Amino acid sequence: CVIVLDALAAATREKLCAVLQLTDTGLTPGSGVGNHRKEVSRRTLGVPVLALGLPTVIRAEQLVGEETPAEGEPLFVTPRDIDQRVRELSRMMAYGIDLALQPHLTVEDITGLLG
């Protein structure tokens, strides 16, 4: 099994840095922001893929309710404190993955491993 993590584009402001998407169908990096990359899935790798995604960006027009001009590139924004949020959320994800894969470890053990 391969575990992949990716940043996602949020559909709503409320989901920005607030939800975690978990799927066994893999992912296509960049697809939420129009920058499609090669799919990472069971079909492409030949093994099960568990994908975790965290919405860290949102289209500006979703915040203001307007469409961007057709000739312009879409504008994506992040919260002002995105660096801190990503540090905290990635740590939370690391704890979850470690506890799921190594159930014999305690939270204290994992804290020692993560530093």
Task: Give the positions of each predicted feature.
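C-terminal functional extensions of proteins
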Residues: 45-115
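Short amphipathic alpha-helices and their capping/turn segments at secondary-structure boundaries
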Residues: 39-41, 45
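Glycine-rich phosphate-binding loop
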Residues: 1-39
